[in-house]
């Protein structure tokens, strides 16, 4: 259910803004999106797993806050990220 370190490194390399970037909003949103998608698949088969559902809702809220921050800070970076991830915003 959790991301492997290799997959996380792939995401970081794809979305990083500079060489040692691991914590920019783009990277954080991309990692959260991957975790959310994985958890969604888990919850499709395990409908009564309410503990994981709560974790999913917390991740979605955190991603929403990061996207709002990025939209307020730099709209072009926000739009590029949303297009690249295929989010509905």
UniProtKB/Swiss-Prot annotation:
Disulfide bonds: none
A GO cellular component entry from the record: cytosolic small ribosomal subunit
CDD domains, per database record: Ribosomal_S15p_S13e
Pfam family, one: Ribosomal_S15
SUPFAM superfamilies per record: S15/NS1 RNA-binding domain
Keyword Ribosomal protein: yes
Keywords of this entry: Ribonucleoprotein, Ribosomal protein, RNA-binding, rRNA-binding
One record GO biological process: translation
Any one GO molecular function term: rRNA binding
InterPro entries in the record: Ribosomal_uS15, Ribosomal_uS15_bac-type, uS15_NS1_RNA-bd_sf
Domain of life, per lineage: Bacteria
Family: Belongs to the universal ribosomal protein uS15 family.
NCBIfam families recorded: S15_bact (TIGR00952)
Subunit structure: Part of the 30S ribosomal subunit. Forms a bridge to the 50S subunit in the 70S ribosome, contacting the 23S rRNA.
General function of this protein: One of the primary rRNA binding proteins, it binds directly to 16S rRNA where it helps nucleate assembly of the platform of the 30S subunit by binding and bridging several RNA helices of the 16S rRNA. Forms an intersubunit bridge (bridge B4) with the 23S rRNA of the 50S subunit in the ribosome.
Protein name per its UniProtKB record: Small ribosomal subunit protein uS15
Organism: Halalkalibacterium halodurans (strain ATCC BAA-125 / DSM 18197 / FERM 7344 / JCM 9153 / C-125) (Bacillus halodurans)
